[in-house]
Amino acid sequence: MKLENKKGYLYLEDGTFIEGYSFGAKGIKVGEVVFTTSMNGYVESLTDPSYKGQILIITHPLVGNYGVPEKKYEQGILTNFESERIQVEGLIVAEHTYPSKWNSALTLDEWLKSENVPGVFDVDTRMIVKKIRTYGTMMGIIASELEIDDPRKYLEKKYDEIDFTQFTSPKSPIFHPNTGDMIVVVDCGIKHGILYGLYKRGFSIVRVPCSFSASKIIEYNPKGIVFSNGPGNPNLLENQIKTFSELVEYKIPILGICLGHQIATLALGGKIKKMKFGHRAINKPVIESNSNKCYISTHNHGYGIISKNDIPPNTKIWFYNPDDYTIEGLIHEKLPIITTQFHPEARPGPWDTTWVFDKFRTMVTGK
């Protein structure tokens, strides 16, 4: 389907120029070009704050066929979106189509337009993904209806050099009251699926900006602390790493997820490195070291613990990926700290590892 036959373009920093057709909003956006192999869940993926600053390629050839539903909330938590708005800078797909589903409120094209996000379709996504898989992620420009004379001037600032949590973290605390123990979520750009997983286990939740100091967090007298997912390079987050290090002294149970896992690793003395093209999919295997069980899990990260030699002292490997042997979770041997690089809440994806939230609840409540 060629919407109005308007041209759209993707420029890659290696000089590759790709021409397709434009849909969504008009304009120019810059970002790191990454891909997900997820076959569904584009609503959740596009609203995942971990994608802030990135242009997303969806490898599944047909996108948009079930449309975009209306937002649904429970206690201020979205139950079918991962944040209030689209987070990606742009979207690249092979084919875009109109929806046929009973609960569709908008087409994908209408949704992108309403949130000022450009898209390009009718391009060879397989070729682009093979290039990224071979040479690694790279910066790119997505543009509609116009060609860019000098793309290099748009690509001077690299993704790794920007703290994107400044765009995804809340500006002030947000409360989600419940009947259970109070926990603090250090919100670097949390997926609402994580919030919902915690809320359904009875926790009263206060989300605080990720710039909050340890002393401010302790003022809430939390029984547990969660460091959330979020976008960007964790090695830039000196304040958050310092905050985690100081919170460790209180011996309060801590759960780190995705970026939170990376912050924990750095705060405890480990190393986080850039991956060649990352893990972005809803069918990634992880093996739990204690039981040797394999779980299928949802991933969205471009940084990680690449080798077992990079784990912090006094921690042991909780999960690892059998495809590339990157480390997918840690347990501290002396402190009540657990982390997962993957997303136990899924959304989208399988629910194999939602029990991680139950383990954290046991750490907090003692039962």
Swiss-Prot record:
Catalysed reaction(s)?
Answer: hydrogencarbonate + L-glutamine + 2 ATP + H2O = carbamoyl phosphate + L-glutamate + 2 ADP + phosphate + 2 H(+)
The cross-references to InterPro entries, in alphabetical order and at most eight, read: Anth_synth/Amidotransfase, CarbamoylP_synth_ssu, CarbamoylP_synth_ssu_N, CarbP_synth_ssu_N_sf, Class_I_gatase-like, CPSase_GATase1, GATASE
Protein's UniProt keywords contain Membrane: no
Sorted alphabetically, which keywords does the UniProt record give?
Amino-acid biosynthesis, Arginine biosynthesis, ATP-binding, Glutamine amidotransferase, Ligase, Nucleotide-binding, Pyrimidine biosynthesis
What pathway annotation does it carry? Answer: Amino-acid biosynthesis; L-arginine biosynthesis; carbamoyl phosphate from bicarbonate: step 1/1; Pyrimidine metabolism; UMP biosynthesis via de novo pathway; (S)-dihydroorotate from bicarbonate: step 1/3
Q: Which Pfam families match?
A: CPSase_sm_chain, GATase
Q: Where is this region: CPSase?
A: 1-182
Molecular function via GO:
ATP binding; carbamoyl-phosphate synthase (glutamine-hydrolyzing) activity; glutaminase activity
An example GO BP is:
glutamine metabolic process
Q: What residues bind L-glutamine, as annotated?
A: 50, 230, 232, 259, 262, 300, 302-303
- Give its E.C. classification number: 6.3.5.5
Q: GO cellular component annotations, sorted alphabetically?
A: carbamoyl-phosphate synthase complex; cytoplasm
- Indicate whether Amino-acid biosynthesis appears among the record's keywords: yes
Homology family: Belongs to the CarA family.
> What does the protein in this record do?
Small subunit of the glutamine-dependent carbamoyl phosphate synthetase (CPSase). CPSase catalyzes the formation of carbamoyl phosphate from the ammonia moiety of glutamine, carbonate, and phosphate donated by ATP, constituting the first step of 2 biosynthetic pathways, one leading to arginine and/or urea and the other to pyrimidine nucleotides. The small subunit (glutamine amidotransferase) binds and cleaves glutamine to supply the large subunit with the substrate ammonia.
What name has this protein been given in UniProt?
Carbamoyl phosphate synthase small chain
Lineage, broadest ranks: Archaea, Thermoproteota, Thermoprotei, Sulfolobales, Sulfolobaceae
UniProt lists the gene as carA
